[in-house]
Amino acid sequence: RVQPEHKTRIVNAWRKNGYITAMTGDGVNDAPSIKNADIGIGMGITGTDVTKNVADMVLADDNFATIVGAVGEGRRIYDNIRKAIQFLLGSNMSEVLSVFVSSIFGFVILKPVHLLWINLITDCFPALALGVEKGEADLMERKPRNPKDGIFAGVDVVYQGILFSALTVVAFMIGNCFEHDTFSLFNADSSHGITMAFLTMSMAEIFHSFNMRSQRGSIFKLKSHNKILWGAAILSLILTTAVIEIPFLANAFGFYSIGLKEYAISLALAFSVIPIVEVVKLIQRAIKK
């Protein structure tokens, strides 16, 4: 047995040396150390009201094994939040960059209504589906994350935004060439180009949602399956195709009914995000080792 102040000193000493601490307790004397720990754990059955109030987590069954499951669930939720944020920020950055490039060269690549559709329809369902992704195999093998680390993905968002933007501009150039026999972007006015750019960006973001199932690991090695993500991706793809192919919707959005050749090119450009991101992940894992 030790005094309450000794428990607090032990917790503070570990934290001062950069370790993540967890403290369990059930009595009033445990409250100070539970409050000072990174994760304060109170007992739901035998614990006092004081310890329950200061604790970050309360064990309803007083079973220490429950702590492991709770930590794993917390890590899974945190991972999924980061995945969804990275997915959405990368998509939004690509839209900003694409519009910026088109402004420099004096042409319209995507109209406001197109961007609104991508944000509300194309991105919405996959982002929600990423929130229910199962935990990765190495979830409990990782070291505790640094509390100072932000929830944003940093460099990954930047390169992914640039990648999607580049693919979108290339798609516009190809569509412009089909319509006007030129790849020039200066003052270009092409309904073919706008349609292919919209389709490429939309599908690239749909494919990218599968990349985001793991921020560092290969998606081809994941043992679990996210059926909700598959459903969300298929729904987004159907809606995106419908807005281009259904005449009254296409007229409302200013799209041209593209042929199978243009559709295949857009699909190929969009799908390229999967192997490209896989290569980047491979390099990141090699550097980390």
Model-derived segments and spans:
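Cytosolic catalytic headpiece
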Residues: R1-N29, K35-I39, I81, S102-S103, ...
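Membrane-embedded transport module
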Residues: R1-A22, G42-R216
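C-terminal transmembrane module of polytopic membrane proteins
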Residues: G131, L199-K289
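Generic signal for short, ordered secondary-structure residues
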Residues: D30, T46, A60, L185-F186, ...
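Residues immediately C-terminal
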Residues: N29-D30, T66, A127, L282
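Structural signature of FAD isoalloxazine-binding scaffolds in flavoprotein oxidoreductases
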Residues: S33-K35, K52-N53
